[in-house]
């Protein structure tokens, strides 16, 4: 029976592992704060009190869009809670099961378009709630009664992720004036690549990504296919795909069958038709070239991105550079030769840099020390003279730093949704300029000629530019649903990116003449203009990436192209598509009257954390440990029942199981984890099975083995509690972690009573009368520290990194038990070629104190399983001066980018060659002697994607072959 259950679990894992990776997700804990909830007939808003206003506004948008959000599907959105996280600058949103909820990161995205962030989130994420509701029908709904929400997740296999995201981007686009899918940059990579649809190789690379080349993500791909299918068939094809799949989940490849059954098509045909049509449309557009002169060359097969170029004198440029081989770093480019040098590596940059007097300022995303859902935007700086990146103290909520001679300005974002422009003159006091409520700031610039600060604003009217001072915010341009970006200023002009012409181009606004001009003409796009002597520095895009370029500007502005104000950009690069008959969220206004009316209709109540810690969302008719299955990939199944719980705040997880097998009888297990205070607490308890014995063995006078007699075993039980303090120190290019832990465990194991041993002629004379003591306590303390650098797209391990840890374990109740002390260290080093990796590791452990035989052997001792030579188990070693070493060399050997179409796509094959060596003192016939074991061999590792899952769901499969040897 257990073998059959295990086989069933493996088959389910093969079918659903990738989708589970996206949906079985622990979001991470927020810092401690007070929470409230608003319940309506359709949704429940759960939010910290600091964002009560944002929660009310978001609820208003949800209720406004609800009648239309299910457009094209036969069922509307499911009833689902929305959980808001206000202290994470890495803006995002997710809809997931286990438990069912919508997660909103409320900090507006830095790189956004002309629709306010909360409207974007509602239009996109609430559409996922529609998809989930249409998949949770028929057989899938029946499975949810058997398995809880785990049963509903099986329905997610019946609609591809790229289709779900593409349909959600369509919703986001159709519920706005000029939304995400219509942005020129959203199709730019495909336009630059050319013949995507005629690619006759395995098309899975376009769905699953590549290590060879840059591939647009599944949002961009999904939108193009979904929008074409709507136009081609005149309806939402995914409605029937979801309907068929939810009622026939036992059919292999439900998407393929449904598309063939209802539309006489398939994914390959849709893909090729989509991009054939797009290419024909793009080829019909007037051909244009780049007016800007490139300053850098881009290599083949290493998609390169230069960002935010800034002038450094007359002969050099400072820019941020990233490519597939290396992470982001600041480089200095010689304008005359195109040569460059690296100045310093950075962390994940959040907003564009600024430079004055040889110092570069920028901001980076930095996770807080304790809480995963507190991610700051940290102000950083670097002097070009020494190239050392530094962190500015107490500047964690900073955006758009702007250096301007004696003044330095930045934008502060408060978790309650308010933006403030802060200006400091030298060492003087700060001046703070508040911005209007319900507006977002997406840029800051200082103009030396008008001696004023300017901001880029997004609100219900779209995007516009304003001047800010102590009297408030004064509009310079009118609001329009035209995306503006990367605001800079100088010489009486504002410079920024704009999509007014239908492509991303560099624009400027003459503050004296009050006129807007287009500076560039581009084949695909020009970005991030910055004024330089006699011209403008910017980046242009082509199939190889973003390159630094320079646009010369005539002194009389005769080369500038006047721009006529408009509420919408030219829809140039998108083929005609019929719009949905849905509400345009750009026309929805949340007023004070709406706030008062909603507060009266739906009152907020305190959301108590303790009563909501337990939230049983799933159950299974088998007994297993889900923590071990996820963390250690260990699946031990028994007949029985398992309940799984996770609270909506992602601060507590738990499971309880009852199982039975014929060897051990009834088995009861409980596991609880809590993360809400920064310290992680783990509680585990078990009951059932046979009591464990820690008994003695010896030899009689003839050398034959003699074992201690055991009484009949009782039922086994154990309980354990541990606490771990993970401290996270993110410092740009380096991420350091310090972990402190303490744990206690008690079990009713039967331990040999060593105090009653009698020795005669070097052997135990009363081994059958020694007896046992019930109960085994284990207390452990540990500390670990690691430091690793960021990994590039093609890296298989960090180029540099190290880990050190030390642990101490003892039994406080039984002095006959030896204490265990152990140390471990490992290091990552670069190999002989790019993306080759060397891993070396070493460990030492030994037992100290406790009862020892005359030979020196400690019969009662603990062991660490860290670094046991491959091919051996912990039963083969003794924790007596145990020393082990390991060395591995790993390298990529092939990027096949092929496989079985739509089933498995192999992206990369890696080879690892390794060897292990260990030695320790063990008891022998002549007393304690050194024993040595070793192993050599290798691993073949396949990086693959199953069932056209996106690049983020890449998995690994490893084949290992090692030759162990006792060595002597």
What spans do the regions from the language model cover?
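Outer-membrane beta-barrel initiation region
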Residues: 287, 302, 558-678, 769-799, ...
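Multi-bladed beta-propeller domains
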Residues: 284-304, 333-350, 381-404, 424-447, ...
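Juxtacatalytic substrate-recognition/specificity segment
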Residues: 22-154, 160
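Outer-membrane beta-barrel translocator/channel fold
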Residues: 369-370, 504, 523-527, 543-546, ...
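C-terminal outer-membrane beta-barrel translocator/porin domains of Gram-negative envelope proteins
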Residues: 690, 698, 707-709, 756-911, ...
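A flexible loop/linker signature enriched in serine peptidases of the S9 family
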Residues: 181, 303, 321-330, 345-349, ...
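Acidic/His/Gly-enriched intrinsically disordered linker/tail segments
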Residues: 30, 116-121, 129, 134-227, ...
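Beta/coil-rich, acidic/histidine-enriched accessory regions frequently appended to metallopeptidases
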Residues: 26-37, 213, 240-358
